[in-house]
Amino acid sequence: MAKKKIHIENSVRRLRFNNDEMTQEQLADLVGISRQTVVAIEKYKYTPSLELAFKIAIAFNKEIQEVFFINQ
């Protein structure tokens, strides 16, 4: 049986702009990652660890499922 890959999407870019147009650098500093990692997350090229996903959600004062979700 072939495993179906789960595609996780996110609303990080939208949340940054809705949060006083937070820069990628500001978010990176808040959660302890590089700006390049923020770019990769926003472009769906990198799926963050569960711990990092929670840190990002907390940075926006959101529940994790409001930031990261499965698109089927």
Explain the meaning of each model-derived region:
Residues 2, 68-72:
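Short, charged recognition helix plus adjacent turn
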Residues 26, 37, 66:
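Residues in the helix-turn-helix
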Residues 1-7:
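A detector for short, charged/polar N-terminal pre-domain segments
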Residues 51-66:
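DNA major-groove recognition helix of helix-turn-helix/homeodomain DNA-binding modules
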Residues 11-30:
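Short basic helix-loop element that most often maps to the first helix and adjoining turn
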Residues 33-47:
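Recognition helix of helix-turn-helix/homeodomain-like DNA-binding domains
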